Amino acid sequence: MSKVTTVFIGALVLLLLIENGFSCTNPGKKRCNAKCSTHCDCKDGPTHNFGAGPVQCKKCTYQFKGEAYCKQ
């Protein structure tokens, strides 16, 4: 059972690294809802206030027809 748990935790860590990526050498600094291709395009972008305080969009998520947009 401990091997299964170790493999599961390792897989979760790997997925987090893939989703969030490693450090960006040249952040794109795009705003929220801007088109992007990787999370580095959105990193260090301007903060926005959507009514719940300042938010910085850091993730590049796919939504429509394979197009990706910067989201929080």
Swiss-Prot record:
Protein name (Swiss-Prot/TrEMBL): Holocyclotoxin-1
Claim: Secreted is one of the keywords in the record: yes
Single GO MF annotation: toxin activity
Tissue-specific expression: Expressed in salivary glands.
Keyword tags: Disulfide bond, Neurotoxin, Secreted, Signal, Toxin
Stated role: Probable neurotoxin.
Record keyword Signal present: yes
Disulfide bonds: C24-C40, C32-C57, C36-C60, C42-C70
Signal peptide positions (record): 1-22
Gene Ontology CC entries for this record: extracellular region
